[in-house]
């Protein structure tokens, strides 16, 4: 293979890794609380997120390397692409993939838990008094981390002794027979990878749909300065109405509240309490408006106003991207259910992938590297961003109980580590979703083609120079023997297909997890409309002058911000 082309491909991957480190660092810096930062926790979080995203971002490099062995125009291998050279490429990629997957599992099950317990064991008073040393703290964190290490060892042993997948009567695996694993060590590692991917896919189906549904709304919503002005006006209106209603009640009794009925006295007490709340809110709004008058904030606000049309366009584009990916995922899921030759017996693997719009775009763009890499990076960041928004909106939960809430500048190191663990597992689920569901055709063979013409001799390749109509795209299962000699599947698709084929239960669970993912987006949007309608009714009830003791004014993100600031101010 030409050395300059290899250098270009790997140089693009190094640039992507640098960008991933920057993205992970910015994410951790934005959400972590500045008052309780830990350099070790920050390093583990940044390194874990960057490592997981680097695993996903290796796919275009994989596709570019294996596709460079074939001339797509003629459907035959390049002169230098002997079987020995092709095996070297796939072997080196396999080592890199296994190393990254092993690193990902190590970070999820060892690195993040150890950092969590290391931070939990810190006692400032004991440390200053000299009673807590680094060795004691290290040993205490290691004792708790041993539980997670035991879980990993147990999973590896289960995979090591799990029975090997064999061909079943009536279900001839054919092409897929070469994907069956005979090595016990590789079988155990594949089981561990499949188990972690199952957990990640469940979290991916829970968090990511809600985040993807919210992304366009984040671009289309009003700016903060405009929302502050609107909130200030509505607060002043509610305060005037409140005081007018108090004057009406006081006018009935001539200033002596003892003459009022029990119902009117309760209403008057409620109005007095609400007046105090509205006055405090108004002061917070005025303080926020004074901050907005500083020149950096003014310049930023004007810049946001100028870029407002582009934000609207970006929100619309995000909506179209989300809709396109949803349709592509649905097409692949239905294709697996209907056209899989052995259904759940072999993990719903496909003999031939049907048309997929997103996969088709990637195949066409991959003919001009790194165009496909840029589009792929944008798609991955889109899903990762949606996952972050979903985790922030839902929080870290155990069943229905919220354990930690993720907020900008207010996330503790413990919550940051748990959020990182959730995002790393989600990224593993995202890796399977993109490779096997979103772009299966591109992820398997890319732009590879083969010449469907019988060669003149067994040692020569088929020549379609004068028969261009016989140049066909590669697929997982082709009727021509020339395809088996010419086409080389990517290493990423080979590893993930082995997970589904050697452990059919994993393949079935991963498929049905994507059904939950597809159903999750619409359900989240429906809940959002119901919540907005509820708040609108409460606000209308208040403005009609029917105070209710348990009433809440219509809430927005900025109102919540002001309330949180008020409670912090009150505690101080």
From Swiss-Prot:
Molecular function GO labels: cobalamin binding
Species whose genome carries this gene: Aspergillus fumigatus (strain ATCC MYA-4609 / CBS 101355 / FGSC A1100 / Af293)
Subcellular location(s) of the protein: Lysosome membrane
One GO cellular component, as annotated: vacuolar membrane
Record keyword Membrane present: yes
UniProt keyword list: Cobalamin, Cobalt, Lysosome, Membrane, Transmembrane, Transmembrane helix, Transport
InterPro entries in UniProt: LMBD1_LysCbl_Transport, LMBR1-like_membr_prot
Function: Probable lysosomal cobalamin transporter. Required to export cobalamin from lysosomes allowing its conversion to cofactors.
UniProt name for this protein: Probable lysosomal cobalamin transporter
One annotated GO biological process: protein localization to vacuole
Domain of life: Eukaryota
């Amino acid at each position: 293979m030409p050395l300059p082309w290899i250098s270009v491909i790997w140089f693009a991957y190094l640039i992507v890794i640098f960008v991933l480190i920057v993205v992970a660092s910015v994410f951790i810096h934005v959400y972590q609380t500045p008052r309780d930062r830990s350099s070790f926790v920050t390093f583990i979080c940044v390194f874990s997120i960057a490592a997981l995203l680097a695993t996903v971002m290796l796919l275009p490099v994989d596709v570019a390397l294996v596709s460079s062995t074939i001339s797509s125009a003629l459907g035959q291998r390049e002169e230098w692409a002997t079987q020995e050279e092709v095996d070297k490429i796939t072997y080196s990629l396999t080592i890199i993939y296994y190393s990254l997957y092993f690193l990902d599992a190590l970070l999820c099950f060892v690195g993040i838990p150890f950092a969590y317990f290391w931070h939990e064991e810190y006692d400032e008073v004991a440390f200053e008094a000299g009673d807590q040393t680094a060795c004691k703290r290290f040993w205490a964190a290691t004792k708790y981390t041993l539980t997670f290490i035991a879980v990993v060892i147990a999973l590896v042993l289960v995979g090591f002794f799990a029975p090997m997948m064999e061909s079943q009567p009536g279900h001839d695996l054919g092409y897929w027979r070469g994907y069956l694993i005979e090595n016990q060590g590789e079988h155990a590692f594949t089981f561990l990878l499949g188990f972690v991917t199952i957990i990640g896919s469940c979290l991916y189906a829970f968090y990511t749909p809600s985040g993807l549904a919210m992304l366009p709304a984040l671009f289309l919503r009003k700016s903060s300065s405009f929302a502050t002005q609107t909130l200030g006006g509505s607060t002043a209106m509610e305060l005037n109405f409140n005081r007018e209603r108090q004057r009406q009640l006081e006018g009935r009794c001539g200033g002596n509240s003892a003459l009022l009925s029990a119902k009117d006295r309760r209403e008057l007490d409620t109005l007095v309490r609400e007046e105090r709340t509205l006055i405090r809110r108004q002061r917070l709004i005025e303080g926020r408006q004074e901050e907005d008058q500083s020149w950096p904030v003014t310049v930023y606000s004007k810049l946001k106003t100028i870029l407002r049309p582009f934000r609207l366009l970006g929100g619309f584009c995000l909506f179209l991207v989300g809709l396109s990916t949803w349709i592509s995922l649905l097409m692949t899921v239905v294709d697996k259910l209907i056209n899989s030759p052995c259904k759940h017996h072999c993990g719903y693997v496909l003999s031939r992938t049907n048309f997929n719009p997103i996969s088709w775009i990637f195949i066409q763009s991959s003919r001009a590297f790194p165009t496909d890499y840029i589009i792929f990076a944008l798609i991955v960041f889109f899903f990762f961003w949606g996952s972050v928004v979903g985790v922030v909106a839902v929080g870290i939960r155990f069943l229905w109980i919220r354990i930690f809430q993720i907020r900008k500048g207010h996330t503790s190191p413990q919550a940051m580590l748990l959020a990182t663990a959730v995002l790393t597992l989600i990224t593993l689920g995202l890796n399977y979703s993109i490779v096997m569901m979103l772009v299966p055709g591109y992820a398997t063979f890319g732009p590879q083609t083969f010449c469907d013409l019988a060669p003149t001799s067994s040692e020569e390749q088929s020549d379609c120079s004068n028969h261009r109509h016989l140049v066909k795209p590669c697929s997982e299962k082709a009727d021509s023997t020339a395809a088996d000699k010419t086409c080389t599947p990517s290493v990423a698709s080979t590893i993930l297909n082995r997970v589904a084929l050697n452990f059919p239960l994993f393949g079935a669970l991963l498929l049905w997890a994507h059904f939950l993912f597809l159903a999750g987006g619409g359900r989240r949007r429906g809940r959002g409309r119901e919540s907005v309608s509820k708040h609108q009714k409460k606000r209308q009830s208040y403005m009609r002058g029917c105070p209710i003791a348990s009433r809440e004014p219509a809430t927005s993100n900025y109102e919540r911000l002001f309330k949180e600031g008020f409670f912090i101010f009150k505690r101080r």
